[in-house]
Amino acid sequence: MRNILIILCLFLLNVSAQADRQERRFSNFNKWLVQNEFKDYYKLGFGEPIGKCKDLEKFSMHWYYNNCDKNKKIIGNYDVNTYNGNSEIPEKIQGKDVKANYETLLYYFWRYVHNDEGNWAGAPRYIDIKPSDNTYQFKFDLRNDKYIKKQMQKTALLSYLLYEDGKIVIDEMSPKDRFGKVYTNETQFHSQSVGKSLASYILGHAICKGYVGNIDSKINDWPIIKNSIYHDQKIIDIINMAAGDQAYFSKNNPSNRYKTGRSVSNTTPKKAMENEFKELKPSKKRYAYNNFLPHLILNYVIFKIGEEKYQELIDDIFRKKIGIEHGMFFVEPETSEPGDRSTRTTFLATRYDYLRMSKAMLDDWQNDTCEGKYLKSLFERRIKKNEQWENNKDSFGLTKSYAGFFHTGLKGMKKRPVFIMDGYGGQIFTIDFERARIVATIAI
C-alpha cells in the first residue's frame, strides 16, 4: 500500500510539473506572437491584481491612479494541440494521419526554432561551424510554378527549391500571411534524419583522407565496441542499417527507443554499449531502421582522428568545399558529459545551405571525385528494404532500397541513381545524379 501511495504521489508531482512547464511555454509563445504581430492569435488583458490593486474597483479613478492598468497580460487566442506535451507534431495517432491546424503549426515552428526546452535549437552544441570565407553563390533562372505557389499558401511547407542544370529555377517560401514573417533565408532549421545522410557524407570524406579504412573495414579498434553487438561488424552493414540489431530496439518505436525503453537519440555510444548492447550477438542481417547507427558511425570518425582534427575536417567540408553562407551546428545528446562526450547527427542550417550541401554531393558524383566514388559505391552496395516500411506517401515507403544512410530505389526508377535525404516532418532533399537535379523542401 505504501509503495502504491509513493508511486501515486510521484505521478501527481510529474503531472503538476508538466502543467507548469506547458503554462510557461504558452506564456513565452504569447510574447513571441506579440513581437511578430500575429494579432489574430492573442489579446491583451489584465493579470491578477497585486498589492493595493486587490482592493480597488477595476477601472475606477483610484485604480488608474495606482497604475493598476499597467499590470497587462497577454492572453492566447488560439486552438493549439500540444499532443500531450510532445516535442514534435506526431505523424500519426492511432494509425491515422495527423492534420495540425495553423495555430498548432505556428506553435511548433516556434518550438523548433527558438531556444525552448526540449528542442534542438536550445540543445548543447557539440560543434559550431562558422560561415565560409568564400560562400558559394547560386545562379538563378527562375520560372513561375502555380502549383508550387498554391501549396506554399495552404500547407506546412516553409521552403521549396528546385535546382537543375547548375541553376535554381524555382525558389518559393511560405508567404507572409502564413510563416513568411518568421521563416527567412537566415532561419536555422533542424535536419532531423537528414543528418544521417550527412553523417555518411562526412564518413566518405574521412575515408578519402585516409582517416578511416573503407566501407568494408570493421570498427573493432574502438575500445567501447569490445564485447558488444557491433564488434566485428563492417561499416557497410552499419550504414546500410543491416547490423542485425533489430531485436534490441522497441517493437513499437524502433527508431527512437531501445528495447529497455530508454531514448536512442539522447544516449551516447559508450552508454549504449554499456547498457543496451553488451555481450549481445547480432541476429539475421536485414534492413532495420533506427536512430542509433548514424550516431555510432559519426562518433567513430571522431574517435579515429580526435576532436581537434574533426573540427578541421568539418571546416574543410562545410566552409571550404560546400561554402556555407550562414553558421550551422551539430548538437550533443542529453547524456553527453566530460569523459563521455559525443555528437548527434542532428544539425541546424538555413535553406540555401541545405541546398549547397546537396549540390556538393551532386558535384562529387558528376566529377567522379574520391567522395563521388564513395557515393557510387553506396549505390552499388544498396540493400532492399522490408515490406513493413512500404507506403505511397513518403520517401520511406516510396523507396525500395537503402544505400549508406540514403533512401533510394524510387518506384518506377529503381535502377536510377536517385538519393533521398529524408527528415521527419518534411525536410526532404532529393538528388537525381543523372539529370543533375535537386528538389529541396523544408516543412514544419
Predicted regions and their residues:
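Classical Sec-dependent N-terminal signal peptides that target proteins to the secretory pathway
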Residues: M1-A19
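Active-site-proximal loop and beta-strand segments within enzyme catalytic domains
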Residues: K149-K150, F179-N185, H190-S191, A206-R286
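Active-site helix/loop module of the DD-peptidase/beta-lactamase fold
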Residues: C208-Q246, I305-R344, A349, Q366
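Active-site-proximal alpha-helical segments within enzyme catalytic domains
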Residues: L293-Y300, T345-N367, Q427-A443
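Active-site Gly/Thr loop motif
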Residues: I324-H326, V331, R381-I438
